[in-house]
């Protein structure tokens, strides 16, 4: 099929990847209202076109935590990303490396830290959950540091997994899930060979390395449910700082007061995020949550935004709403599932081209030039 946008990659991934993995990435929690609002709220913000400005020199690059990024985006942590392409985390990391942006490895990745880090030149980021087993957390931080990871992304909006009803229907969870997955593999032979056979082992690499035994995909949801720690508090940041000296970003902030606390407890950045609508359905979209957070802490801490970004225009919208950078999750997973490393590289090229068009026609030569004045909120017209 012809690929011209991220939405095309979504359709291509739907065809190639079996339903239990496609819907795991594509779905949200409960009735998926927040998932839908993440997209629609961005769509309802129009760009303010300005003309007859000299836009012959345009720069999409930024510096973030001492790193030069070719565009203001980072590939977000995605659990079990290695199930969308053969050793998928390695392919996605190499694509990000080639395009000059960071890749964030999830705690619950298929490929372990020690496999991904040597495959790329630039330092990757590492994402960590608060888990009941503090020994695992300490081990993961030590391994990430030893592998040269530059930035820690500390995810705080998962003290318990969200209720993802779509997973029950797709075979990711629910009755007879193992049989349903095998049957889906038969109807998706290219994926079954490339990932199912050539992409083994299908284990949670970081967890298995620590446990000394294989924690497979069948154990994935159960392991998360058992090990997430609902006692998480701001004091956990102080404990983590004992083992991590580099930049630390708190992911899962939707309230200005929490953003202020992140500043107070010494975080270097926050990610304004509702976990892509995968945790608590009914919360604010990131686009709606971002402006008051930016008003509260802009300049005191780096602000990254995710959830709902489907094209380069959405990146410009998030920047104008107050973000310093963005994270891409579903968009790169669709591309990875559709075409592996090449798909992710092409997706990033598409986003960058869309950004350049938007910046040119809103008369913003650099990323720091993009301000709220570049937007028109259609809901107020």
UniProtKB/Swiss-Prot annotation:
PROSITE patterns (UniProt xref): FMN_HYDROXY_ACID_DH_1, FMN_HYDROXY_ACID_DH_2
Keyword annotations from UniProtKB, A to Z: Cell inner membrane, Cell membrane, Flavoprotein, FMN, Membrane, Oxidoreductase
Annotated CDD domains: alpha_hydroxyacid_oxid_FMN
FMN hydroxy acid dehydrogenase domain location: 1-380
Transmembrane segment boundaries: none
InterPro entries registered for this protein in UniProt: Aldolase_TIM (IPR013785), Alpha-hydoxy_acid_DH_FMN (IPR012133), FMN-dep_DH (IPR000262), FMN_HAD (IPR037396), FMN_hydac_DH_AS (IPR008259), LldD (IPR020920)
GO BP, sorted A to Z: aerobic respiration; lactate metabolic process
Keyword Lyase annotated: no
Cofactor field: FMN
Compartments in which it is found: Cell inner membrane
Domain of life where this protein originates: Bacteria
Residue sites binding FMN per the record: 106, 127, 155, 251, 306-330
Pfam family for this entry, one: FMN_dh
GO MF annotations in UniProt: FMN binding; L-lactate dehydrogenase activity
Bilayer disposition of the protein: Peripheral membrane protein
EC class name: oxidoreductase
Any Gene Ontology CC annotation: plasma membrane
Active site: 275 (proton acceptor)
PANTHER family associated with the record: L-LACTATE DEHYDROGENASE, S -2-HYDROXY-ACID OXIDASE-RELATED
Family, similarity comment: Belongs to the FMN-dependent alpha-hydroxy acid dehydrogenase family.
Function: Catalyzes the conversion of L-lactate to pyruvate. Is coupled to the respiratory chain.
Annotated protein name in UniProt: L-lactate dehydrogenase
Taxonomic source organism: Haemophilus influenzae (strain 86-028NP)
């Amino acid at each position: 099929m012809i690929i011209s946008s991220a939405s095309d990659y979504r359709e291509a991934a739907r065809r190639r990847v079996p339903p239990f993995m496609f819907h795991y990435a594509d779905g949200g929690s409960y009735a998926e209202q927040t998932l839908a609002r993440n997209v629609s709220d961005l769509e309802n913000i129009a760009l303010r076109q300005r003309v007859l400005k000299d836009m012959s020199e345009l720069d999409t690059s930024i510096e973030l935590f001492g790193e030069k990024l070719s565009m203001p985006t980072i590939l977000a942590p995605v659990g079990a990303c290695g199930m969308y392409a053969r050793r998928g985390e390695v392919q996605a990391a190499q694509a990000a490396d080639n395009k000059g942006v960071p890749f964030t490895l999830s705690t619950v990745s298929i490929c372990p830290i020690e496999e991904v880090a040597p495959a790329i030149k630039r330092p990757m980021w590492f994402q960590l959950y608060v888990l009941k087993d503090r020994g695992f957390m300490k081990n993961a931080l030590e391994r990430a540091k030893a592998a040269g990871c530059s930035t820690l992304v500390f995810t705080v909006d998962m003290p318990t997994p969200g209720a993802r009803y779509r997973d029950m229907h797709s075979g990711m969870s629910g009755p007879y899930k193992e049989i349903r997955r095998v049957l889906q593999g038969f109807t998706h032979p290219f994926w079954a060979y490339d990932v199912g056979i050539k992409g083994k082992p299908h284990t949670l690499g970081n967890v298995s390395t620590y446990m000394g035994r294989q924690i497979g995909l069948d154990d994935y949801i159960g392991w998360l449910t058992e090990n997430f720690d609902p006692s998480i508090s701001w004091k956990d940041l102080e404990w983590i700082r004992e083992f991590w000296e580099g930049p630390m970003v708190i992911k899962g902030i939707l309230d200005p007061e929490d953003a202020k606390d992140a500043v107070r407890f010494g975080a270097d950045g926050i990610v304004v995020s509702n976990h892509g609508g995968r945790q608590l359905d009914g919360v604010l979209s990131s686009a709606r949550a971002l402006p008051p957070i930016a008003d509260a802490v802009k300049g005191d801490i780096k602000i990254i935004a995710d959830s709902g970004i489907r094209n380069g225009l959405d990146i410009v919208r998030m920047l104008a709403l107050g973000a310093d950078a963005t994270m891409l999750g579903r968009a790169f997973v669709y591309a990875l599932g559709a075409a592996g490393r090449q798909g992710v590289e092409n997706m990033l090229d598409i986003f960058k081209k869309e950004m350049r068009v938007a910046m040119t026609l809103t008369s913003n030569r650099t990323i720091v030039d993009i301000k709220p004045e570049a937007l028109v909120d259609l809901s107020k017209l």
